[in-house]
Amino acid sequence: MEWHKLTDRTGYVSIGNAFVPGYFLTEDELVLIDSGPMKSTRLMEMLDERHWKVRAVILTHVHIDHVANNALLLEKFPDIVFYASQEEADAIASPENMIRDMGFDTVEHAKQTQAIFYPENIHIKGIDMKQSRIQIDDEVFQLISLPGHSVGHTGVVTPDGICCIGDAIVSEDVLRVSKLPYMAYVKEALMSMEKVAELPYETYVIAHQSVERKVDISKIVRDNIAKEHQLSQIACEMLTKPMTKDEVLAKYMKTLHINQRAGIEMVIIVHNAWTRYIDLINQGKIECRDGLLYRKDRADEEGS
């Protein structure tokens, strides 16, 4: 496994489909930004070989593809500290919260995921975003509120100015192949994308899988926003007649070539699709009456 240097103190490793950044507090002690999308024995081996100690992990958010090595890191470094925004920490505090904030459909599914990725022995310290900073030793990590992809998604700026924006946007390569980028709250996600475009930093680490300079970030943001507007338009166009939630979601996912399958992953995908309709309802473009969804520009005609 290779450590890719961005500055003297900040770099990243590539795990699966994600970059995991880190900042060195000393020559051999570092803070990671997220812990990766899959358990990585290679990461643990690299830490052993180089005699590096991970003092803390600052989570941009608590989706399972950003916390997969938390348990291994805790086993290796029992005094490690995990941080996330208070909203993210609260989102996994109970199965009921996971249903409310993370798209799970049942307590059983939430408990299954909680047992694997958010066990009781891993305590995530919630940070009040009014504070917007974490100090570790004499080093300060700035936090940027970027909700939308998740309830309390956060950007993390290392003490030397590298801006790690998690999943607030995705790279151009990922955007080209992604059928339905995950959004918990569409309106907030779009506002956060616009916020990213206005940030002053020179270097940005996008979790799935890109390092970009300030000069390029505005175009990537515009492309992410355009993709979301396209997906919203397609969602609206599915309602050629009054339809139930299940009917329109099945049609939407078929149009996007998303194959239906069993399992928790599909539960989250369906919720991801439904967030587009929640946003359209909030915009007043769609309304729900008697268990049916109507396009507002056709609702009067269809209801008469």
Locations of the language-model features?
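Conserved beta-strand hairpin/beta-sheet module of binuclear metal-dependent hydrolase folds
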Residues: 1-50, 155-166
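Active-site neighborhood of phospho(di)ester-bond hydrolases with catalytic His/Asp-centered motifs
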Residues: 32-36, 55-63, 83-86, 145-148, ...
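Active-site HxH/HxHxD metal-binding segment of metal-dependent hydrolases
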Residues: 39, 45-133
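Aromatic/hydrophobic pocket-lining residues that form the small-molecule binding cavity
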Residues: 67, 189, 273
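Pre-recognition alpha-helix immediately N-terminal to the DNA-recognition helix
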Residues: 230-238
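C-terminal regulatory/interaction regions
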Residues: 237-304
